Amino acid sequence: MSNKVKSDIEIASKAEILPVTTIAEHLGLDADALELYGKYKAKLSYDTIHSLKDKEPGKLVLVTAINPTPAGEGKSTVTVGLGDALSKKDKKTVIALREPSLGPTMGIKGGATGGGYAQVIPMEDINLHFTGDFHAITAANNALSAFIDNHMQQGNDLDIDGRRIVWKRVVDLNDRALRKVVVGLGGPIQGVPREDGFDITVASEIMAIICLASDLKDLKKRLSEIVIGYNYKKEPITVGEMGYEGALTLLLKDALKPNLVQTLEHTPAIVHGGPFANIAHGCNSVSATSTALRLGEYVVTEAGFGADLGAEKFLDIKVPALGKAPDCVVIVATIRALKMHGGALKTELSEENVDALAKGFTNLQKHTESIQTFGIPYVVAINKFITDSDAEVAKLEALCEEHGIPFSLTEVWEKGGDGGLELADKVIAAVESGEADYKRIYDDAWSIEEKLEAIVTKVYGGIGVELSSKAQKQIVEFKKYGWDRYPICMAKTQYSLSDDPTLLGRPTDFVIHIREFIPKLGAGFVVALTGDVMTMPGLPKKPAALNMDVDENGNAQGLF
């Protein structure tokens, strides 16, 4: 390798990419199973998905992480690299990932298809518009907003209270100026004035529904159950009462189909759906994972941010819908993030600091304990960065050995699948041990308060929950409607185990503050908003978009 570090897009643009029909052949599928979007991208047809339903599922590996730095810790990179390593071990492997959101791509991340020599391609297409799934979800979401405002303009037969509409518009960008807006201005013919707001598309309930629906029939049913707001008697109003579930299903009929692409090393990858894990449930679609499990011997998937967010939601929300629990969990840890948790400044994370690393190790310990609470064996993947010193690597390995934590030093960013062979061996051993004995940390029959308590004490390591007066009133209301039977989806900062993003490491004796609940009945969960978490992010001072361009031949530049 050259001393110059190549960017992700430089590596991806020089890679040999096979026709997606060839990738499908590796899975035993012919061209008729695909709906092509050019040479290198395809959707799997409904006939294909239905034909696989009775096949025995393969083994499932979930990749999660410790609480990350703002730049992320390489969870997607490890997912891809592990998939390629398993392929090299002669395991028929399929990777199942989420689709990237344009918001963070243009904002801070610059892309989300893995990195270095562990990427999913065509990365340029996947990071931008891909097969149009997010645009379809945005259109369906905003069509519903238009239907709501039109209903109020045209007589308001359902007595919708404009002050109590909870459905927001969305756009797949980070745009803080749209968090709170007023619509319907300009006089009687322009609509009924009311306060509104925008979320990012990946926070839309329709995104969550796409990711949890099993088929078109289930999609339509879930869409009909969306609560859009309340009438003047404070009774909930659903999409089904308005009668628009059919139109919304029509807009989403292609977006429900999973997308097939490949890694740099030609491992099949099914990339579909993309809810954030801090403000939604953070997992790719049930349809994608289920299909992958019936096409591969091993499936490697990921859940967003740390194990306190994406993994908890995968295990408590997605697994019941999927009907299959992971056989092994991989927890990605980086030396730079552990140093941050040990008190090192974010501007100094590339400098050697063994003491900060040792102090921050407690964050990793907590995440390993949380995964064990769910009864699933795990392996820690130490995702090696070029800034990691030999002393830091040796210290982290020694700490893992001292505390009986199974680990593997992973170099997939630099070496692709070859850098993850040891990790693959340890994952295979964990899977084949048969030790997985999955159990949820709460039952759906429990009260909302009991579910919150379970998540906070067992996964976050806190001592309890504090409810705002609004949240307390909502619990009474939700019990009346039977909404307390749904799982809880916590909306919480990704940077801390607590709801305070500045409280790093392994904090203790903290409480989680619930400011309000949002019923997402179509998705099948209740969102609990904590702290100051936002459902529409903002851009940083210098967005990643400043470095993006396109050359005269139409080739993208600056995606990373």
UniProtKB/Swiss-Prot annotation:
Pathway: One-carbon metabolism; tetrahydrofolate interconversion
Domain of life of the source: Bacteria
Enzyme class (EC, first level): ligase
Keywords: ATP-binding, Ligase, Nucleotide-binding, One-carbon metabolism
BP terms from Gene Ontology: tetrahydrofolate interconversion
Pfam annotation, one family: FTHFS
EC number: 6.3.4.3
Family, per entry: Belongs to the formate--tetrahydrofolate ligase family.
Protein name in UniProt: Formate--tetrahydrofolate ligase
Lineage: Bacteria, Bacillati, Bacillota, Bacilli, Bacillales
